[in-house]
Amino acid sequence: MQNLPDVLASSATPKTLQDVLAVTTDTCIAISDALKQGSLAGILGMAGNENVQGEEQKKLDVISNDMLKDALISCPSVRAIASEEEDYIVPANTDGEYFIAFDPLDGSSNIDINAMVGTIFSIYRQTGDKPATEADFLIPGKEQVAAGYVLYGPSTMLVLTTGDGVNMFTYDPTKRVFTLTHEKVQVAKDTQEFAINMSNQRFWSANMQSYVNDLVKGKEGSRGKNFNMRWVAAMVGDVHRILCRGGIFIYPWDNKDPSKAGKLRLMYEANPMAMLLEQAGGKAHTHTQRILDIQPEAIHQRVAVILGAANEVDKCLSY
């Protein structure tokens, strides 16, 4: 079986990008080790401060962010990083080739109950002869050269695309390497599973409420078939399920908090997941445009997200 370095070396992936991916995934292995320690290492619970999103940080949010930041800014191929947990971008090496944006610990509210979490990352090639600025980082998702996530579940898995399909790697703790276990993953175009936080239904648009009501009505409704609902409360877990067995994930626009009409971050969550889904034959949209076509206006910009099985995304958009 091939491990991650072998797969990248046998592809058209540039050596400098291989280096960035190696640093990223090696750090995720260290994060996985830290997660396994849990209460034994005193790393659960709140850190006692908020991030730029106005969210209370968990101790492991801060720990995982610092681990990735320190490792990546030391990588000669990295020009700058942006993190969900950092107020501003962090310039690294002026002669580096790549920007990397990441959510160091997606689903961190799950940490204290020992449920699924993950690290999401997005990589762009962007060279220059001056220190990087936030304006340099505002690149549409269609320009990503790689995207992926590491899922910390019963096994630790890496899901990765470099623009030539989606591969899944399982971490082998005896060898401390990611080994290729699922190649060229494809998402079925039709589905009978959906993932959405139903507690927010009253805040959605009328069109979205109508769509979800039709799913819930099942065979007795206009869809003529039953649907199951799933919700992990971590985007990384819900998207992983869709890549493994199909479905649609929706975090729609809502009016619960007008300052955060979209919940998920474009740069750290929506763009990398959209690239993965499209590479696997799915679709990713906001309800007004393709996610990968969005011109970012700020590194912490939020958007609505509808992604998954191509035909079901189209059906949702038709409402």
UniProtKB/Swiss-Prot annotation:
Binding positions for substrate?
106-109, 197, 263
* The keyword Secreted is assigned to this record: no
Principal EC category: hydrolase
Instruction: Please name the pathway.
Output: Carbohydrate biosynthesis; gluconeogenesis
One MF term in the entry's GO annotations: magnesium ion binding
Q: Per its Swiss-Prot or TrEMBL entry, what cofactor is needed?
A: Mg(2+)
Q: Which InterPro entries match?
A: FBPase_C_dom (IPR044015), FBPase_class-1 (IPR000146), FBPase_N (IPR033391), FBPtase (IPR028343)
Residues the entry annotates as binding Mg(2+) 2: 103, 106, 269
The note on the cofactor says: Binds 2 magnesium ions per subunit.
**EC no.?**
3.1.3.11
Family per similarity comment: Belongs to the FBPase class 1 family.
Record note on quaternary structure:
Homotetramer.
This protein's name: Fructose-1,6-bisphosphatase class 1
Per the UniProt record, the source organism is Marinomonas sp. (strain MWYL1)
Record gene name:
fbp
